[in-house]
Amino acid sequence: AKNAFNAKVGFGQFDTNYGVAKNGPNDKDVIDDKDAFYAKAGYNFGFAKLGADYIKFQNNEVLNDELYGIDLYVPVGDFRVQGEYVKNTTTTEKYDDAWNVGLGYGKADWKKPGTWALDVFYNEIGKGTYFGGTGLGTDMLKNLKAGEQIKFWNVGADVTLQKNVQLHAEYAFGADLEKAADPDDAWTVSLNYKF
């Protein structure tokens, strides 16, 4: 496959208002402006794409975690199967990994009105791998700091309404939060423009 291998590395600041980190509820323990090194590599085999991730937080008494991840994407005609797994190798949390697996159909092409895509994912996320922020459009993960692990389903859809205009919707449901109250179902709808 053309451009089969890709890689990138970086070093930067990690900012979050997710709350307190590992040492307790004191303000001094809030994760803020902390250095992090990351590396990402992937290979497109043609029949599948495989990726690997690494992140290491630096110079921080509160947040010095090290995480490894792997992801796989397999197109099968108009369908796609994908998943990812992340493990925190330095945390003392009982639930130190996260994973998801999903099935999708279709492709919402920004240039072709009427095209659409639908995806469904099952997610299982441990407290030891979540530091705030998400690629989800919903706030399903906001209560994870009160529990230990969350399991839930997520359905997402995109429809191209006209060239460079898409409607996006997500619905997260069936949540089970370990050692805390289960969060309510969550949803979002957005209209997106590409310039």
Indicate residue ranges for each PLM-predicted region.
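Mobile, glycine-rich extracellular loop/lid and propeptide segments
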Residues: 1-24, 35-41
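Outer-membrane beta-barrel pore domains
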Residues: 24-29, 42-195
